[in-house]
């Protein structure tokens, strides 16, 4: 079992409640293969990987929001292009 000290991660995020929300969101992304891990997996579960990414400052709420916004913008562009092709 991997041992993870979350004190550094709490300091990066601000408080433990936001840490839980951020880590859960990131772990879900990893679990569903929506995003590749930013740290070596080392046979760890997605939750541990998420906490390590947060601890190293690679992931936070703002970064995930920006990534999600970019993905949504790409989807919207694709949909608009498809609609334009249909209406021509």
From Swiss-Prot:
SMART domains: RNA_pol_Rpb6 (SM01409). GO terms for molecular function: bacterial-type RNA polymerase core enzyme binding; DNA binding; DNA-directed RNA polymerase activity. One of its GO terms (biological process) is DNA-templated transcription initiation. Its EC number is 2.7.7.6. It comes from the Bacteria. The RNAP catalytic core consists of 2 alpha, 1 beta, 1 beta' and 1 omega subunit. When a sigma factor is associated with the core the holoenzyme is formed, which can initiate transcription. PANTHER family: DNA-DIRECTED RNA POLYMERASE SUBUNIT OMEGA. Promotes RNA polymerase assembly. Latches the N- and C-terminal regions of the beta' subunit thereby facilitating its interaction with the beta and alpha subunits. This is DNA-directed RNA polymerase subunit omega. The lineage of its organism: Bacteria, Pseudomonadati, Pseudomonadota, Gammaproteobacteria, Pasteurellales. The gene is rpoZ.
